[in-house]
Amino acid sequence: MKANDSLAAKFQEDTRIPYVLYQLAKSYYMAAEYTKACAYFDCGLYFDLNPRLEYVIDMVETYGYALLNSGQADHALFLENVYEEFGNTADFNFLMGLIYMNNEMFDAAVVEFKKALKMPEERARGVNSYLACYNIGVIYECLGQMTEAEQYYNRCGGYEPAEKRLENMKK
């Protein structure tokens, strides 16, 4: 047992291992093998990581998307546990909005999408503008709040799916 503890301690000290696990996970994610990606992201996040490193931020966010894409939206709720470290970006707020939306936690989803809208910068295009507005519109439409839905669809700046929703609402 002590040999295993010693090996685990060595792995914990080697800062290259989480990055290699991240690269493997990202490769599986890009190949749309989301379940395999999740396994490697999970292993990579086991390590004590610096949440300010760019690859760590990307690992957390991409893991969330991999969980959603592999039908594990309920498991993705664990990202609430790292909200304090990562919740200061439009990308993470948008991701949490999607996670809440997929778990039918619509009020929480709207709160997160609105937080994303207030953020000045984003890494993924649209998460702090038209995509957040679109998802808020979808939620309001599904809840029967058509006036609010229309307002948010109109804020999407010509985003085609929002335009189609507006057309359907007029029928």
Identify the function of each model-found stretch.
Residues N4, F41, L79-E80, F113, ...:
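Hydrophobic/aromatic packing residues within the alpha-helices of TPR/SEL1-like helical repeat arrays
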Residues A8, G44-Y46, E84-E85, K114-P120, ...:
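Amphipathic alpha-helical segments of tetratricopeptide repeats
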Residues A3, A37, H75-A76, A109, ...:
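Single-residue signature of alpha-solenoid repeat helices
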Residues V127-K171:
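Terminal, low-structured helical/coil segments at or just beyond the last alpha-helical repeat
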Residues T15-L21, R52-E61, G87-L95, G126-C133:
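Generic helix N-cap/helix-start motif at coil->alpha-helix transitions
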